[in-house]
């Protein structure tokens, strides 16, 4: 870890006060409170860290902590969150925001997310937030967008391809082309739509999520979750869904 020895398994960087008096996850929470009501903010977390995070952000209702039995990468985690959100509101728009991002300019963030929400209201699509690159970074994945396919909503473009973390020479070519954005791992879509995409492209994960969904709100939930989670294969949302789906768009951000 870049923050070792401060950042360890029991105290990940999300719980470090790297930028002042507040932890990274508290800063993320503060940012989200500008765009969402308190009861609509969820935390996907391991059981080991849930108490630490709840102590740091006691405002978030305990029932909004979605516990992952074990880490299985982003696709299963997002699918599990989508289940809980869809159960509460079948028409809900959900955003996915890592808790360890440094974002300067909360008003810019709010505007970008508002535009992304407009887009997913207009058509059934998946939105990924792309950061305009300032140097040829090799530590990020990249999104290639089609500048000729600009949507009616400000800053939204059709995605051409996703690229894994490149070598420096490739990253330099990406920057020169002007067609690539950093993949920030932030997404906006309707819960229903991402669950449909999981059904299309990740049928085994969908089957497990289906069983978990049926157990939501029952005494059997934790037993079913643990059983099905054992069957789930680790996979990123990028590889599992976004690189395969046809209805993927990006919105350019400069925060």
Regions found by a protein language model. Name each.
Residues 65, 126-128, 250:
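Conserved beta-strand scaffold positions in the cores of enzyme catalytic domains, especially
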Residues 2-5, 9, 17-98, 102-114:
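Conserved N-terminal catalytic core of the sugar/cofactor nucleotidyltransferase
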Residues 142-255:
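Catalytic core of tubulin tyrosine ligase-like
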Residues 44, 95-98, 128-132, 163, ...:
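Short beta-strand segments
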Residues 34-36, 87-89, 95-96, 119-122, ...:
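Solvent-exposed alpha-helices and their adjacent loops that cap or buttress functional pockets
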Residues 71-76, 135-137, 168-170:
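A short acidic, often aromatic-flanked loop/helix-cap motif at beta-alpha or helix-coil junctions
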Residues 29, 33-36, 57, 89, ...:
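Structural signal for hydrophobic packing residues in well-ordered secondary-structure cores
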Residues 102-137, 144:
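Conserved donor-nucleotide/metal-binding helix-loop-beta segment in metal-dependent transferases, i.e.
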């Amino acid at each position: 870890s870049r923050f070792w020895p401060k950042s360890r398994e029991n105290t990940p960087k999300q719980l470090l006060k790297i930028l002042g008096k507040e932890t990274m996850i508290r800063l993320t929470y503060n940012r989200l409170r500008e765009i969402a009501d308190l009861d609509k903010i969820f935390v996907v977390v391991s059981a080991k860290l849930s108490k630490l995070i709840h102590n740091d952000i006691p405002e978030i209702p305990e029932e909004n902590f979605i516990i992952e039995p074990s880490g299985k990468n982003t696709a299963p985690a997002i699918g599990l969150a989508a289940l809980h959100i869809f159960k509460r509101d079948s028409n809900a728009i959900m955003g996915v925001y890592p808790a360890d991002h440094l974002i300067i300019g909360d008003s810019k963030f709010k505007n970008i997310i508002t535009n992304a929400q407009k887009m997913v209201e207009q058509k059934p699509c998946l939105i990924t937030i792309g950061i305009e690159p300032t140097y040829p970074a090799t530590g990020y994945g990249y999104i290639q967008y089609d500048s000729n396919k600009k949507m009616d909503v400000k800053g939204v473009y059709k995605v051409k391809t996703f690229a894994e973390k490149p070598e420096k020479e490739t990253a330099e070519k990406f920057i020169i082309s002007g067609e690539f954005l950093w993949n920030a791992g932030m997404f906006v879509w309707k819960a229903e739509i991402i669950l449909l995409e999981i059904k299309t492209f990740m049928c085994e994960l969908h089957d497990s999520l289906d069983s978990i969904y049926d157990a939501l709100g029952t005494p059997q939930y934790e037993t079913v979750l643990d059983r099905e989670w054992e069957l789930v294969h680790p996979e990123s949302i990028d590889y599992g869904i976004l690189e395969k789906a046809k209805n993927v768009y990006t919105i350019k951000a400069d925060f």
